[in-house]
UniProtKB/Swiss-Prot annotation:
The active site is at D167 (proton acceptor). Residues 299-351 form the AGC-kinase C-terminal domain. Belongs to the protein kinase superfamily. AGC Ser/Thr protein kinase family. cAMP subfamily. One of its GO terms (cellular component) is cytosol. Residues 42-298 form the Protein kinase domain. Keywords: ATP-binding, Kinase, Nucleotide-binding, Phosphoprotein, Serine/threonine-protein kinase, Transferase. The keyword Ion transport does not apply. One of its GO terms (molecular function) is ATP binding. ATP binds at L48, G49, S50, G51, S52, F53, G54, R55, V56, K73. It comes from Aplysia californica (California sea hare). The modification Phosphothreonine is found at T198. The modification Phosphoserine is found at S339. This is Spermatozoon-associated protein kinase. Ovotestis.
Length: 351
């Protein structure tokens, strides 16, 4: 298939969007605002998720519309210190407060008390893309192009802000009430300047250069995007094995096979994104994301319209009745205790 033609109009709007969004990110990142908000102003409703040193709770703010909810990430200071995650957490707070993409979950506020650190995230209430994919088996092609367009723009936005997102998978993509996507669960600990060799991410979505211990700071994670597009269309990932080393071999060999129902345009796009040689991988060439945006598989997809959320989503979650129990797993609840004395006043003084 012929190399993509770069259309001037797509080049112009993408360039303008990336320039303005980077300027906004830099302005917020350099401010490092310290909030005096208190957790006592929130009603904690239920646990949405739990991790090594904290949990995420569905919450409401006393002064807001009672229908408006937030997802508050609550981190225990003592656990953060013991796990040597102070610097990571401080950097993550700064980065999350600076992000402003419509396809990335935003952090609206961050504050602390004597015991915990709190990050107030926008609550995306339609559940995970993973659950939709498991329910449907595989998704219609139009759904796939609609979702892939948003993830492409989310990854390009993060890359443009020097942020490396290394855990792309359906479980980390949420659906909002309009049926649009938001990427979440970043784990950002720094802005990438130079090179990084860290092996992290979900095994089936790892890029070959991560497994081969090659630096990958200069390449945005289009390999993971290719795996996601494949899985949405097929219902399964292209490389899988229960033995990790065997799985890594399959990823590095990169011998792609396609279901018979994959169209030639989809096969061509995936062959060029799921590509071991980063010098030939779409997204990393001279035209950047435009090689993906202008690919024939996306010929009926209006990226600008999707960016403005003016395109009607192919599927909208049903949020009536007991939706919270249908879209989020049940967790054991624990009360949030706040001590009188702060054992770590210096470590988190700038949080």
């Amino acid at each position: 298939m012929a190399h993509n033609q770069v259309f001037p109009e797509s080049q112009k709007w993408l360039k303008e969007y990336l320039e303005s969004s980077l300027e906004q990110f830099e302005n917020l990142f350099n401010k490092n605002v310290i909030s005096t908000e208190s957790i006592r102003n929130y009603t904690l409703i239920r646990t949405l998720g739990s991790g090594s040193f904290g949990r995420v709770m569905l919450s409401q703010h006393g002064g807001d519309n009672p229908q408006k909810c937030y997802a508050i990430k609550i981190l225990n200071k003592e656990k953060v210190v013991k796990m040597k995650q102070v610097e990571h957490t401080m950097n993550e707070k700064r980065i999350l407060l600076s992000i402003g993409s419509p396809f990335v979950v935003r952090c609206l506020n961050a504050f602390k008390d004597t015991t915990n650190l709190y990050m107030v995230m926008e609550f995306v209430n339609g559940g995970e893309l993973f659950h939709l994919l498991r329910k449907k088996g595989r998704l219609p092609e139009y759904w796939c192009t609609f979702y892939a367009a948003q993830v492409t723009m989310a990854l390009q936005y993060l890359h443009n802000c020097s942020l490396l997102y290394r855990d792309l998978k359906p479980e980390n993509i949420l659906l909002d009430h309009l049926g649009y996507l938001k990427v979440t669960d970043f784990g950002f600990d720094r802005r990438v300047q130079g090179h990084t060799w860290t092996l992290c991410g979900t095994p089936q979505y790892l890029a070959p250069e991560m497994i081969l211990n090659r630096s990958y700071a200069s390449q945005w994670t289009t390999g993971g995007l290719g795996i996601l597009i494949y899985e949405l269309n097929a219902g399964f990932v292209p490389f899988d094995h229960k033995v990790p080393l065997k799985l890594y071999e399959l990823i590095v060999e990169c011998r792609l096979t396609f279901p018979s129902f994959f169209k030639p345009t989809l096969r061509d796009l995936l062959t060029n994104i799921i590509q071991v040689d980063v010098t030939r991988r779409f997204g990393n060439l001279r035209n950047g994301a435009l090689d993906i945006i202008n690919h024939p598989w996306f010929k009926d997809t209006d990226f600008r319209k999707i960016l403005m959320k003016a395109e009607k989503a192919p599927w909208v979650p049903n949020l009536k009745g007991q939706w919270i129990h249908q879209t989020f797993d049940k967790w054991t609840e624990e009360s949030i205790s706040i001590s009188k004395h702060d054992k770590y006043p210096d470590e988190f003084s700038n949080f």
